[in-house]
């Protein structure tokens, strides 16, 4: 079994890459693929680049060239749901776009025409994650949260951005810039997927400073959770 793991930035894949005993590196269209093993599993680790187009391009190349049986997305996110703290981990059971509006043609806000309104994380992987992280976070100051993640081609930090997202997605937990695009490609290739992100900022006016300060913590939390999950697959 080959497992595809995707992170947008070097910081989000570095820890995982450093656990690989040997690596074959392939670069296609600016997307960087690292082929090797993590936790005894065959993996293709992708550094896709930031944003929906880069994520979709990289995921398509991953699916077409390397034929993964599972896709997992790692990285950081802005916590917009109540009670979230920096370092918490969000496991997405649903994803949607926060900046797609074709409602004039009868689609739900956030829905790309002829695509589902929400992309569902794989039920089997979600169940595995729930079991693992309940034990992993039992004695931690951080926690794992399950819920809706919204993807925008914008860094979310302003009140007006919050208002739009909450108007259409009142149960949103976190925001970021790639996951729904990854989920859409996985859906179109019929590949089970799971999105695991750690909170690097609270998507507020201090978000830029918080992101710069805590991106490595978020990347570490997310990577550790993925390694623990790989051990069970």
UniProtKB/Swiss-Prot annotation:
Fetch the InterPro entries from UniProt. Answer: MTA_SAH_Nsdase, Nucleoside_phosphorylase_d, Nucleoside_phosphorylase_sf
> Which residues are the active-site ones?
12 (proton acceptor), 201 (proton donor)
Cellular component GO terms, alphabetical: cytosol
Pathway it works in: Amino-acid biosynthesis; L-methionine biosynthesis via salvage pathway; S-methyl-5-thio-alpha-D-ribose 1-phosphate from S-methyl-5'-thioadenosine (hydrolase route): step 1/2
Q: Which HAMAP family match?
A: Salvage_MtnN
Tell me the PANTHER family matching this sequence.
5'-METHYLTHIOADENOSINE/S-ADENOSYLHOMOCYSTEINE NUCLEOSIDASE, 5'-METHYLTHIOADENOSINE_S-ADENOSYLHOMOCYSTEINE NUCLEOSIDASE
* Family designation: Belongs to the PNP/UDP phosphorylase family. MtnN subfamily.
Name recorded for this polypeptide:
5'-methylthioadenosine/S-adenosylhomocysteine nucleosidase
> What organism does the UniProt record list as the source?
Listeria innocua serovar 6a (strain ATCC BAA-680 / CLIP 11262)
